[in-house]
Curated annotation (Swiss-Prot):
It comes from the Eukaryota. CDD domains: NAT_SF (cd04301). A zinc finger (C2HC MYST-type) spans 212-237. This is Histone acetyltransferase mst1. The gene is mst1. GO terms for biological process: DNA repair; DNA repair-dependent chromatin remodeling; positive regulation of heterochromatin formation; regulation of transcription by RNA polymerase II.
Length: 463
């Protein structure tokens, strides 16, 4: 018995050191007053020591951050990633057998499923965007190359690529591992210093500076304050480079053609990617229009937010990407952008819907807008109505109307048919919102606006 006790006393729990932490391992890092499991996405050696870029489990990516070993509790252990399975290679002279007739028929009739993309460790050749640049470009925006660390994307057939583009237009989900790491520390735009939320494919050298200075009019980017000040002395732009199509006593809207203002539109896409996680930037902005909302002062028109849309959308999308700059969020500008997009859709005599997927904040804003529009219409009607009639009056798609009614639990089955029913709670909540003073888009100020018409050559990607 005593021998067993001696043997147990010799058993020691494994102790870990900082050198045991590897890429993609999981550790317990201090966050919000307690230690939480976090995944190691990058390890860097700096002058002050080794730092780790971590993603906390069940947390949004915008909360990813750099931490030191002092924030990691090694006594709780390290969870290592599973080893990668070796790929099976066919030997020389071996030909794959043809599948049986039954298997061939099954493969034809079965619905196809797209496998999730896996990042490759190979480095692609440097790629540059095609098309001519705008006049007046500078060293800060001559080209927008992908970062060297960018991984080679999966090879897709023409049909798969078209389907992927059609699913999300100008932007798609970014499958690359490098895109999981926020590469810009801080940006300075106007009087505001902002910490970005996500990765954006700015040139590599900008990830090595403390602050990236961005012009609030042309959105050119610089790595030093001196370069930025020299640019401001020469920059003559005081508003977005397009036509002002809407103006009231509060805001203005400018319409910009991506084909005519490539550099400006690319710069605004790079900036917006810092605050959008679910989408990846395409450098060819030719097939898109940009509608920019600005506030005016004695210095010019300052961008508050914008949305882009395809010049021609086969799915009737009236919006490709939407963003309110962080310094202007929670002031009601998002709803103004959404309302303006639907006002344009009404002038086009169409039904519209935003491209999917929406960001988390975008989805919240759209659901609130849809709910307000539908409840307002239903409460104001004295006769029976249908989903198609609601869609026609709001320029929303029938799917969006149906989704909103279901989300609000307004569809009830009564005497063999579905009816629209508003509960007392929803009506009271709507009355409270109605009493709040909020700015709205005046559709009458768009009476002179005509939907732009484009030649087929102006609608294709030019890369």
């Amino acid at each position: 018995m005593s021998n067993d006790v001696d043997d147990e006393s010799k058993i020691e729990t494994k102790s870990y050191e900082a050198k045991d932490i590897v890429y993609k391992s999981k550790v317990f890092a201090f966050k919000d007053g307690e230690y939480r499991k976090a995944e190691i996405l990058m390890i860097q050696k700096r002058t002050r020591g080794v730092v780790y870029y971590v993603h906390y489990n069940d947390y949004n990516k915008r909360l990813d951050e750099w931490i030191t070993i002092d924030n990691i509790d090694l006594s709780k252990g390290i969870e290592y990633p599973p080893p990668e399975k070796p790929k099976k290679a066919h030997g020389k002279g071996k030909s794959s057998k043809r599948p049986k007739a039954v298997d061939r028929r099954r493969s034809i009739t079965a619905p196809s499923k797209t496998e999730p993309s896996t990042p490759s460790t190979e480095k692609p050749e440097p790629s540059t965007p095609s098309g001519e640049s705008d006049h007046g470009s500078n060293a800060g925006n001559e080209s927008l190359p992908l970062l060297e660390e960018d991984h080679k994307p999966e090879s897709l057939s023409k049909e798969q690529e078209v389907e992927r583009l059609r699913f999300s237009g100008s932007m798609v989900q970014n499958p690359h591992e490098i895109a999981r790491i926020r590469n810009i520390n801080k940006i300075c735009i106007g009087d505001h210093e902002i910490e970005p939320w996500y990765f954006s494919p700015y040139p590599k050298e900008f990830s090595e500076v403390d602050i990236v200075y961005i012009c609030s009019f042309c959105f050119c980017y610089y790595g030093s304050e001196r370069q930025f000040q020299r640019h401001r002395e020469k920059c003559t732009l005081q508003h977005p480079p397009g036509n002002e199509i809407y103006r009231d006593d509060y805001i203005s809207f400018f319409e910009i053609d991506g084909r005519k203002q490539r550099t400006w539109c690319r710069n605004i896409c790079l900036l917006s990617k810092l605050f959008l996680d679910h989408k990846m930037l395409y450098y060819d902005v030719d097939p898109f229009l940009f509608y920019c909302m600005c506030r005016r002062d004695e210095y010019g028109c300052h961008l508050v937010g914008y949305f882009s849309k395809e010049k021609e959308s086969s799915e009737n999308y009236n919006l490709a990407c939407i963003l309110t700059l962080p310094q202007y969020q929670r002031h009601g500008y998002g709803k103004l952008l959404i309302q303006f997009s639907y006002e344009l859709t009404k002038r086009e005599h169409k039904h519209g819907s935003p491209e999917k997927p929406l960001s988390d904040l975008g989805l919240i804003s759209y659901r609130a807008y849809w709910a307000e529009q539908i409840i307002n219409l239903v409460l104001g009607m004295r006769t029976e109505t249908t989903i198609d009639e609601l869609a026609n009056k709001t320029s929303m798609t029938t799917n969006d109307v149906l989704h909103t009614l279901q989300a609000l639990n307004m569809l009830k089955y009564y005497k063999g048919q579905f009816i629209i029913c508003i509960s007392d709670g929803i009506e009271q909540q709507y009355e409270r919102l109605k009493n709040k003073k909020r700015r709205r888009i005046n559709g009458d100020l768009l009476a002179d606006w005509q939907p732009p018409v484009f030649h087929p050559s102006q609608l294709r990607f030019g890369w």
